[in-house]
Amino acid sequence: WKKWKTDYHAWLNSLSRLRSGGKPAVSNAMFGLYGLLQQFETIQKKLTKERISEESEKIKGHTEKDEKDALESRILRGTLLELLKEVEQATRDYALNSSLGNTAIRTQKLVQSVETLEELPGLLRLNLKDVTALEYFFLKVLRLWSQP
């Protein structure tokens, strides 16, 4: 997860040079976005699987299929929400600790990024796929942080 956050910070940093970098910078930003999505999904699945196996051991054999499905769904959502909180913290850390300085524009970008992240739980409750919701966030962040 630490590597993911480092990659995320590097991706955010590259967005500040997007306009001056030409087509290669744009393609790198897009490939970076989908690389981060893939890594995020892999991490989420791994954490969820570990937590499900831990919980399943606690309630061995005493549950029906419906109860087990509900448990798995709850763990999946809980893990995702926990990771989204950490994405918010990583975005905040980048915005406040960046070498580019803490300007009013950076603060506004941070606020808009966090607002977008806060929309995701509602979209997920409406059965939007996890990866699609996160893709929405990353595309919005790409647009926000690539602006001068």
Feature locations, PLM:
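Charged, glycine-rich active-site and insertion segments that engage polyanionic ligands
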Residues: 1-86, 93-148
